[in-house]
């Protein structure tokens, strides 16, 4: 059981937000440590990695009629970098779901080091830490289904919600979630 994180756990907390002309990753070091965790500057020094991915797809206003892809590599996430990072230590993935991202490039059920996945929706690092430490009990449900892959999204019936798609369309389904630890 990876969550909640226990007191004094050594945590490498990295946010990964694609930026123009800047480093995409940022090691988060809170000014005030209200979580009884030890924040470290490298994955090697950590007991666990908390990696928060914030994919950035094209604006719908920029749409040119071509397919919108939901895989992470098409949405400014360096999956080679992410896979290298999560291979180092047990990892909690947090993903900001502005779209129903397909995360198969970095996760499947056999992923040996990914011990938990959290969906965020425009929150703050502090709120994420409140959840992973149980300072606040999680209580959330997915507002949509996420496709198991970009290919599944491209081949879906466009007029059918993901939770009504047949077979193995979804990795996470509509209304799936957690209510406390």
Model-derived features: positions:
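C-terminal non-catalytic regions of proteins with extracellular/luminal or membrane-system context
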Residues: 1-181
